[in-house]
Amino acid sequence: SVPPRVCRCPPGRPTTRQASAAGHGPYVSTYEILSSNTWIAVTFFLLLQWRIRMFVHLGALVMPLAFVMMGFALMGSAELKALSPTLQSAWLLVHIVFAKLTVSGMLVAVALSIAQLLKDSRAPESGFLTKLPSVDVLDDYAYRLVAFSFITLTVMIITGSIWANNSWGHYWSWDPTETWSLVVWLVYGLYLHGRITFKWSKAISTWYIILSFLFSIVAFFIIPYFVKSQHSQYMVG
């Protein structure tokens, strides 16, 4: 069965109460988006850990990343917001589900990449590092998770375009958030291209994953604060 820890993760209950009280899912403010991202990412990792036992000790890296994300969530306003008519769409829900799966896959891929850097460092291995799989195995799973995230990101963009057409009458308007989503998609596509075509080394791949994740954070969660877009109504605040 799934480890019982999944029921004790702190972001879950406030996110659930928030969604219940507002009458909509947790996707209408920075607090709701990031706290639900944290909850889903931790659940995603626990499911991976359940299926792939060698991931048990990777939690020492995944959980700090999750707590940082939750910390940023708590910096946002927890004020309940009404759901605007443009957000009342089944396509939006699909769009959001795949967005959260993308974040989850990226987060665990980054944890695997950090684990690779620690195991590759000249310092002698100690503690949980000795219990992690080899660098080759970590690299392989990081690659798989980025491929998974690339697929979910693709679905996120496609369903977002369908939602935009239903709400505003166009599939693509080069809205800043749309544009930066495309840039992030190209960044992760370049990683897969580099791995498959140019046989990038593990060192290049590891750093690329980490830097790409940082770039995606800026694109999805920081730029909307400075550039007005159709997404700003629910991503900022």
Predicted regions and their residues:
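Hydrophobic cores of alpha-helical transmembrane segments in multi-pass integral membrane proteins
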Residues: S1-A82, V94-S121, V137-S167, S173-G237
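Active-site-proximal inter-transmembrane loops
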Residues: L83-W91
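Short helix/strand-bridging catalytic loops that position acidic/His residues to coordinate divalent metals
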Residues: Q88, L132, W168-Y171
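Membrane-interface interhelical connector segments
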Residues: R122-L138
